[in-house]
Amino acid sequence: MKGLKFGIMALVLLMASSLSAQSIKESFSAEGRENWKPEVTVRGNLGIYAGGFAVTGGVRIDEKRTLGLMVGKNVNVYTVRHGYADVNSFSAALYGRRYLHLGERKIFSFYSDLALGAAVVTGMEGAYWVNPVDGTTKKDDIDVEKGDVQPYFSWQPGMRVRFYKNIHLFLGPTLSSHCLGVHLGFGF
């Protein structure tokens, strides 16, 4: 447990170390903006009772940081009286990514993504059942309804491997308000 706490603190400090006022000022100056490059990733999330996919799009403001927008489709599985119910949602969040490159060629990199936004429940499947006694439709006790807005938070640390030119593989754990599991994705 101490190792997990130490790892979380180390990654949070890694993200915070990139937020010095001078480095932000340099990245957003006229000269710094000339070096901005687009960065897009597509990733899938798989957890114990959740799954989905996300697309991120942003700008790499320097060699170590990316800022952008993350949108995704999430499915959470709830255990209900008659089996399982799927709650579908759509999320949008602002995210920041911090890289720690290994070696001069930057083939391998550790990264940490932090995202904060909102998720809207778009529908439910399996939450409704027909009462065999009187034939009425019942809804199981799930505390969400279609149209509900929920806070969305995600932390995805991991390893990035560059394959060819600017094509990368992303792999690591996912700790979010909608998924506890792993993620795998590609970026360019």
For the regions a protein language model found, what residue spans apply to each?
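Cleavable N-terminal export/targeting peptides
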Residues: 1-35
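Extracellular loop and loop/strand-boundary signature of outer-membrane beta-barrel proteins
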Residues: 41, 79-85, 140-145
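Short glycine/proline- and aromatic-enriched beta-strand/turn motifs that initiate or cap beta-hairpins
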Residues: 21-73, 97, 183-187
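Surface-exposed loop/turn segments flanking beta-strands in extracellular/periplasmic regions
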Residues: 27, 32, 131-138
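Short polar/acidic secondary-structure junctions
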Residues: 45-47, 101, 174-176
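Gram-negative (and chloroplast) outer-membrane scaffold detector with strong preference
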Residues: 56-136, 156, 161-167, 188
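Gram-negative outer-membrane beta-barrel domains
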Residues: 146-150, 154-188
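Residues that define the transmembrane beta-barrel architecture of outer-membrane proteins
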Residues: 34-38, 49-53, 86-92, 108, ...
